[in-house]
Amino acid sequence: MKNLNTYSQKLRESGLRPTKQRLKICEVLFSPERTFHFTVNDLTKIISEKLSEKISLATVYNTVHAFKKKGYLKEISINSDKSYFDTNVSEHHHFFDEDTNELIDCGIDEIDSVNIKKNITGKKIKSVEVLIKVATDNQNQN
C-alpha cells in the first residue's frame, strides 16, 4: 500500500493522473530492488507482459517523459534515433555496447577526470556525463 501511495504521488507531482496503467509503469520503474536501462519500446513490452493486456505506446512515452522532466529518470541519447532511460539518476557515466545494444553503468570514480578546456562566458558547468561507445575489435580476432 505504501508503494501505491508513493507511486500516486510521483504521478501527481509529474502532472499525471494515477491510472491503473501508469501505476503499473511505476511498479516496474521504481521497484526498490534494482535500477535499469530501457527504451520506451522495451518498457511498453515489459508492462504489457506484466499487465497481461495492451498498454499504449503513447501512455508509456508520455509517462516516461513526464518522469524525466521531473528528474525521476535520466535520458541517455545514443544517437538521433535512439534514447535509453535510466532509473538510476545519481551522477554516473555509461558504456554503450554497439554489438548488444546494452547500456552499462560506469561510476564517476571509474573514469579519470575530464579536462574541459573551453569556457562559456557567464555559464558554469552543472554536470558532466560521458557516454563511451564500444564494439567488438575485429582486428584482433583470428
Predicted regions: what they are:
Residues 1-26:
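Short alpha-helical segments that sit at the start of domains
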Residues 11, 47-50, 67, 118:
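Hydrophobic alpha-helix position signal
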Residues 16, 31-35, 50-51:
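Short helix-capping/hinge SLiMs at alpha-helix to coil transitions
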Residues 24-27, 42, 59-62:
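Amphipathic alpha-helical interaction segments
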Residues 39-52:
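DNA-recognition alpha helix
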Residues 60-70:
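Basic amphipathic alpha-helical segments that dock to polyanions
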Residues 70-142:
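Non-DNA-binding regulatory cores of transcription-related proteins
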